[in-house]
Curated annotation (Swiss-Prot):
The keyword Hydrolase applies. Zn(2+) 3 binds at residues 73, 101, 131. This is Probable phosphatase Ent638_1550. Its EC number is 3.1.3.-. It comes from the Bacteria. One of its GO terms (biological process) is bacterial-type flagellum-dependent swarming motility. GO terms for cellular component: cytosol. The lineage of its organism: Bacteria, Pseudomonadati, Pseudomonadota, Gammaproteobacteria, Enterobacterales. Pfam families: PHP.
Length: 245
């Protein structure tokens, strides 16, 4: 098990069922050292108001030795790469994931999806692309992986894509992992937990990475320091409270 989980939802996204406190408790039980809360961006019908994201700055950095990253799973809105994370939200958060969600960006065609995803990657506002293997949003996987490597944006391998959501993602996720491997990019693993009990669950992700021989040194979740160094390399501020993670 890796000690870092980069994708999960709380009761602030009303189709999820756990609180921040629940995740902290599970992190302590499971040996998770750093996790990111990434509730849905405000353009989703059940998402929190943008004030929720701005006010995350009041959260403690560490609770019982567990580090908490203030994040969002923003929505890709259009082919210009716009996302629903702007203004004060950008400066209040530590980490921004973005991806396609049908209520905000209805599925179209492969070229449109690819254009939108690459524009989002190139925008400089996003650190990780969520569930790029979603079969409802086919993309040019090679082109996206090359753009992600060029702009130092990680592509996610999402454990829920193999278990609860986005059925039929397996082959695409394998292709994404192989393309990122060949392009020299990074992957981020996300449990995409909607309940704290699946925090840190990467079993299916690990199978895919093993199948394609993905290099361990390019998996962001291996240590907290690797993830934090990645964020700092993209211009995010150093977080002194995490010095000993």
């Amino acid at each position: 098990m890796y000690p870092v989980d980069l994708h999960m939802h709380t009761v602030a996204s009303t189709h999820a069922y756990s609180t921040l406190h629940d995740y902290i408790a599970q992190a302590r039980l499971k040996g998770i050292k750093l996790f990111a809360i990434t509730d849905h961006g405000p353009d989703m019908a059940d998402a929190p108001h943008y004030w929720h994201f701005v006010n995350m700055r009041i959260w403690p950095r560490l609770v019982d030795g567990v580090g908490i990253l203030r994040g969002i799973e923003a929505n890709i809105k259009n082919t210009d790469g716009e996302i629903d994370c702007t203004g004060p939200m950008l400066t209040s958060l530590d980490m921004i994931i973005a991806g396609f969600h049908e209520p905000v960006f209805p599925p179209q065609d492969k070229d449109t999806h690819t254009q939108a995803m690459i524009a989002t990657i190139a925008s400089g506002n996003v650190h990780i692309i969520s569930h790029p293997g979603n079969p409802k949003f086919p993309i040019d996987i090679q082109a996206v992986a090359q753009a992600a490597a060029k702009h130092r944006v990680a592509l996610e391998i999402n454990n829920s894509s193999f278990t609860h959501s986005r059925m039929g993602s397996e082959a695409n996720c394998r292709a994404v992992a192989a393309a990122v491997r060949d392009a020299g990019g990074m992957v981020a693993l996300g449990s995409d937990s909607h309940t704290a009990f699946t925090l840190g669950e990467f079993t299916e992700c690990r199978k895919v990475l093993d199948e394609v021989g993905f290099p361990e040194e390019r998996i962001l979740n291996v240590t907290p320091r690797r993830m934090l160094d990645f964020l700092e390399s993209l211009g995010m501020p150093h977080i002194p409270e995490f010095a000993d993670l």
